[in-house]
């Protein structure tokens, strides 16, 4: 018998290498690992051991003696085996002394090894059973019938795409079968490769299985999601009314007269600086008012107000008529397809002329009902409160005609009216609920931020637990200040709200980056043309988001030739040290609107010489910036002739050129002035003086009545009788 390694022997007898190593160690044969080479006699001993074990297994199978316990049965079998061995050994006669002695020695060794083996088997309870355990799986496999193929499903659904493995699992087939079918269709695919819709449909049609693709709604873009409510779920909701009109025509005063509060007195300069939302009750029915500022710089906010509104009240002063901002308001309302009620205010004034107002508004297709049109006109006085009841009745009448309804029994959806950063409460947002009911504790996504509604306050300053459709509320609990005009939506849990909020913020960041880096050829040409244009860098900080947007829009509208406004940063809150550092690095001016710099910011501004401009009225901001931009422009110059000299004689000097011997006839000739050479009334050359001398000395200027020597830079064609005219470019103030 030849030599073999441990693992080869184990493989031959279908036993683990560990068992073979264990047996060899019990036989006092040193083995290191499964690669150890076994001698022929060692292999023979191992064969003998495994043969004995298999015989014992066979005996146990046929006899099956009654055993009180497995341990006792093992003892009994061991003793019986040893007795048989002894008897056999005694019965055999000795042929030769030497041979007998050798055989006895061999037998004694074998018996000792067997005894050790069985003792180990007793302790472990494993020895004689190993062969049985190894042999069992083969018989089981032989008995098992072939696997039946799963029945094909009638229909499968998928979302987006499926891998080959996923499709095979859904169809109850092996991936190799799917890969084969794809190969036959000309598609080379691996088990983890994504399949498109066409490939999935081809495979499924081959098996006769229907395919349905699930359409997933991207909730991160919830502004575009339209949820259609059942008609029976809809209930009547209050109308949302926006008051629009020209500055100082009495919008805020009218709203105050309606809700009996004095908002105008709190506003700087008597002009509303940001949107406020209020709710009033009239004849048992509620009306929500949005006060959109009338100054034209707030065009962005007014457009946003028209998007959330149901009815527009166009306030026109009876003594002033239609103004530019009145026309703007009409255009915004028409663009939003919102019905207009015209309120002719200031009827208490003696110079009031409502007919003129109605005549002017007819040019914009606002024809009064009394003149055969369909626009409601209300004559009133906000100051004396005359005609206000009639206006409110008209609002309710129009809202009934519009059939304004919403479903309150769903997750809330709406728009941010205003947002600000409060020192004590953190980010605060005024929300207008447009559908559903907003409750305290709701997980909410607002624009690109998220949070949980911690507290809700109505327009009266009272805490409320829920807000239904068309109700404005101020909420806290957001992680950041949203943008005015952002949409909000309530989600089922805070985890999902956080994921969607973060995803929206990330998407917005990517969009901003792509806008900054994307350049078309047209833009590139424009930038090249604007290469010499100066930029005025600004950092804008304001008390509320609406004011920030309004200031940015107003400043960017300023058009001074040669200067471009660049808003480096615009945000809500006080002016901080980080704003000053940003201004330092970008060479910017900081504008604060209704905010002040903190102590650290003041100190940093003083040390870095950063210009901070603080204002409370928007007109002043625009005027001051315009003035600054005019100062930054390249100054305008005008030509001023300072003297004339007549060429009396010329001298040609090598390495110097032509020297003109002149006599100053008028004014003076200076060394730094520009000159033009005039010959017979025609300008021959314009340039600069190279040298100016009187006798042999260089002089700064030569006055009238004196002679001098002049050389003109890069020009030598000077003749007697020519006139040298000296002039300077003088800076003049820009108009």
Swiss-Prot record:
One of the essential components for the initiation of protein synthesis. Protects formylmethionyl-tRNA from spontaneous hydrolysis and promotes its binding to the 30S ribosomal subunits. Also involved in the hydrolysis of GTP during the formation of the 70S ribosomal complex. Residues 245-252 are annotated as: G1. PROSITE patterns: G_TR_2, IF2. It comes from the Bacteria. CDD domains: IF2_eIF5B, IF2_mtIF2_II, mtIF2_IVc. Keywords: Cytoplasm, GTP-binding, Initiation factor, Nucleotide-binding, Protein biosynthesis. Its main location: cytoplasm. PANTHER family: TR-TYPE G DOMAIN-CONTAINING PROTEIN (PTHR43381:SF5), TRANSLATION INITIATION FACTOR IF-2-RELATED (PTHR43381). Residues 121-133 have a biased composition (Basic residues). GO terms for molecular function: GTP binding; GTPase activity; translation initiation factor activity. One of its GO terms (cellular component) is cytosol. It holds the Pfam family IF-2. Residues 52-154 are annotated as: Disordered. GTP binds at residues 245-252, 291-295, 345-348. Residues 236-405 form the tr-type G domain. Residues 291-294 are annotated as: G3. This is Translation initiation factor IF-2. It comes from Geobacillus thermodenitrificans (strain NG80-2).
């Amino acid at each position: 018998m030849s030599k073999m390694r441990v693992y080869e022997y184990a493989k031959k007898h279908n036993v683990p290498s560990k068992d073979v190593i264990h047996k060899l160690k019990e036989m006092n044969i040193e083995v290191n690992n499964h690669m150890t080479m076994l001698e022929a006699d060692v292999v023979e001993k191992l064969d003998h051991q495994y043969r004995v074990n298999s015989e014992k297994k066979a005996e146990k199978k046929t006899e099956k003696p009654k055993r009180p316990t497995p341990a006792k049965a093992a003892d009994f079998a061991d003793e019986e085996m040893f007795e048989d061995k002894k008897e056999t050994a005694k019965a055999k006669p000795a042929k030769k002394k030497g041979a007998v002695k050798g055989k006895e020695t061999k037998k004694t060794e074998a018996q000792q090894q067997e005894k050790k083996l069985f003792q180990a088997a007793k302790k472990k309870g494993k020895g004689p059973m190993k062969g049985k355990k190894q042999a069992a799986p083969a018989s089981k496999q032989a008995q098992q019938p072939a696997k039946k193929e799963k029945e094909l499903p009638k229909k499968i659904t998928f979302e987006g795409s499926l891998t080959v493995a996923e499709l095979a699992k859904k169809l109850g087939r092996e991936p190799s079968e799917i890969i084969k079918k794809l190969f036959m269709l000309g598609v080379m695919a691996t088990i983890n490769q994504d399949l498109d819709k066409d490939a999935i449909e081809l495979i499924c049609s081959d098996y006769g299985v229907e395919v349905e693709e699930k359409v997933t709604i991207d909730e991160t873009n919830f502004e575009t999601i339209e949820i259609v409510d059942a008609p029976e779920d809809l209930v009547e909701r209050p109308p949302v009314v926006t008051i629009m009109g020209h500055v100082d025509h009495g919008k805020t005063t009218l709203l105050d007269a309606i809700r009996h509060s004095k908002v105008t007195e709190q506003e700087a300069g008597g002009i509303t600086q940001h949107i406020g939302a209020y709710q009033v009750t009239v004849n048992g029915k509620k009306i929500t008012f949005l006060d959109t500022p009338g100054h034209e710089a707030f065009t962005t906010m007014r457009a946003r107000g028209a998007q959330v509104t149901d009815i527009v009240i166009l306030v026109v002063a009876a003594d002033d008529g239609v103004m530019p901002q009145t026309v703007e308001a009409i255009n915004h309302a028409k663009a939003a397809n919102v019905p207009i009620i015209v309120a002719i205010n200031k009827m208490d004034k003696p110079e009031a002329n409502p007919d003129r107002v109605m005549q002017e508004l007819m040019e914009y297709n606002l024809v009064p009902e009394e003149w055969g049109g369909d626009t409601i006109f209300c004559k009133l006085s906000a100051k004396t409160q005359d005609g206000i009841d009639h206006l409110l009745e008209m609002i309710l009448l129009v809202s009934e005609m519009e059939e304004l309804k919403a479903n309150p029994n769903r997750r809330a959806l709406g728009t941010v009216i205003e947002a600000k950063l409060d020192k004590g409460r953190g980010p605060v947002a005024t929300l207008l609920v447009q559908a559903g009911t907003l409750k305290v504790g709701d997980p909410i996504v607002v624009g690109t931020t998220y949070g949980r509604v911690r507290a809700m306050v109505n327009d009266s300053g009272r805490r409320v637990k829920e807000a239904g459709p068309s109700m404005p509320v101020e909420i806290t609990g957001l992680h950041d200040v949203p943008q005015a005009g952002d949409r909000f939506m309530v989600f089922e849990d805070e985890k999902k709200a956080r994921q969607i909020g973060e995803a929206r913020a990330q998407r917005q960041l990517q969009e901003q980056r792509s806008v900054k880096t994307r350049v078309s050829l047209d833009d590139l040409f424009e930038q090249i043309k604007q290469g010499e244009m100066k930029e005025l860098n600004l950092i804008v900080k304001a008390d509320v988001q609406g004011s920030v947007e309004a200031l940015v829009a107003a400043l960017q509208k300023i058009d001074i030739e040669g200067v471009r406004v660049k808003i480096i940063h615009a945000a809500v809150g006080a002016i901080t040290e980080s704003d000053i550092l940003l201004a330092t690095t970008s060479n910017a001016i900081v504008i604060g609107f209704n905010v002040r710099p903190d102590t650290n910011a003041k100190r940093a501004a003083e040390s870095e010489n950063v210009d901070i401009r603080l204002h409370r009225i928007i007109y002043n901001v625009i005027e001051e910036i315009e003035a600054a931009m005019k100062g930054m422009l390249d100054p305008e110059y005008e030509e001023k002739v300072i003297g004339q000299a007549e060429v009396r004689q010329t001298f040609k000097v090598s390495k110097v050129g032509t020297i003109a011997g002149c006599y100053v006839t008028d004014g003076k000739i200076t060394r730094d002035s520009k000159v033009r050479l005039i010959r017979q009334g025609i300008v021959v050359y314009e340039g600069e003086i190279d040298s100016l001398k009187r006798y042999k000395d260089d002089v700064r200027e030569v006055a009238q009545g004196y002679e001098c020597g002049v050389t003109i830079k890069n020009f030598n064609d000077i003749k007697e009788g020519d006139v040298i005219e000296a002039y300077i470019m003088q800076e003049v103030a820009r108009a």
